[in-house]
Amino acid sequence: MTLQRFTALLLIIGPILPFLMFPIWPSSDAESTAESVKAIGDNTTLSTIVFTVAHLGFAGFVTGYFLLTKQLQNGVAGGAATVANAMLILSAPLIVLQFGLRLATISSISDPQISEPIIVETLLVVSGTAGDATGLFAGIAMVLGAYVLRQRNVNAVLTTVLAIAGIGFIVDTFLSGNSDLVDTIGFVTWIWFSLSTIAVGVFAYRNKLTI
């Protein structure tokens, strides 16, 4: 398997894994941090499985974009590709950090010595903040990546869709609160990102990207 096809598979499979987990995400219906903690604690085994699969997907698409931007560094708009690659390097440890904090949340719920609500809720909130930071760096990388691909004469619709997804991630980083509007914007941004990333993966797999 060529590097380009391996990259393509990561971009296709990566977004699909978290998407499959959303229907069974433990705290999807929670309206507060306390409710989220309770939902996770009600089934710690399911929560562990869901978080693990989802974060494998997160790591997959970040690795896919990392490999893609690495391959784009030579040639037209190579400087932008290099910066995009650096943004992805910065986002990778944040995904690991978020996963670790979510596992720590589950462990804290199960441990009577550290199961104080304030501790558990703080862990969960910090894990979410790490996810926001990931979105910022990944969003910048996607906007730059879209620019590079467009400079390589890749389909204009695809690059525009990818750029919009990146902008959505950047904007979502600066939105705060638990309002329905904020949640809706975040959900729509994630769906848009997932579909655009899969589309990039399909183009790469079919050798439609000029690398």
Predicted regions and their residues:
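Hydrophobic, aromatic-enriched alpha-helical segments typical of multi-pass transmembrane helices
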Residues: 1-211
